[in-house]
């Protein structure tokens, strides 16, 4: 079970809302979000309702302002609690429809280019666990949540291009 608290003001001040499950529309509970406290679980936050728009992955911890979660503004309109899974395994392919060179990954990777010489990934096969894909190396840039399943082309995970810099398992290390 997870627990996250959203605060309208920086530094955990102002009106707040506590949440322990997925919410497709947080607008009725707060008008802006400038700080967050994650007491348990891993969460994906979305700037738009219905799990749309830019995404932000948060683990247990305190985020006193939106820059701490790499946010571009104070808009959080939906959230998803990421289920805990024991093992993680995915396959990346350099071309669409699982073509080209394939690599299987079971651990976080801060630079796909340095480790595998990939700067673009066109398809994924998420076999176990939930993953967070980052557009840039060292877990920076746009983020995308990958749940178990098939991603035949980059549009399937919501991206506008095939640029992938790093991957991280969606796990709470505490």
Swiss-Prot record:
GO terms for biological process: lens development in camera-type eye; visual perception. Keywords: Eye lens protein, Repeat. One of its GO terms (molecular function) is structural constituent of eye lens. This is Gamma-crystallin F. It comes from the Eukaryota. Residues 84-87 are annotated as: Connecting peptide. The gene is CRYGF. Residues 2-40, 41-83, 88-128, 129-171 form the Beta/gamma crystallin 'Greek key' domain. SUPFAM superfamilies: gamma-Crystallin-like (SSF49695). Crystallins are the dominant structural components of the vertebrate eye lens.
């Amino acid at each position: 079970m997870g627990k996250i608290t959203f605060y309208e003001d920086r530094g955990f001040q102002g009106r707040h809302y506590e949440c322990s499950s997925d919410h497709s529309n947080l607008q009725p509970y707060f008008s802006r979000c400038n700080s967050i406290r994650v007491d348990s679980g891993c969460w994906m936050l979305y700037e738009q309702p219905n799990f749309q728009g830019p995404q932000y992955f948060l683990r247990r911890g305190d985020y006193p302002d939106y820059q701490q979660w790499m946010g571009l503004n104070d808009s959080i309109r939906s959230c998803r609690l990421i289920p805990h899974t024991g093992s993680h395994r995915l396959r990346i392919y350099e071309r669409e429809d699982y073509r080209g060179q394939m690599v299987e990954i079971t651990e976080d990777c801060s630079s796909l280019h340095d480790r595998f010489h990939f700067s673009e990934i066109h398809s994924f096969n998420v076999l176990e666990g939930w993953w967070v894909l980052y557009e840039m190396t060292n877990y920076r840039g746009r983020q995308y949540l990958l749940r178990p399943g098939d991603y035949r082309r980059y549009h399937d995970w919501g991206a506008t291009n095939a640029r992938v810099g790093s991957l991280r398992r969606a796990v709470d290390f505490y």
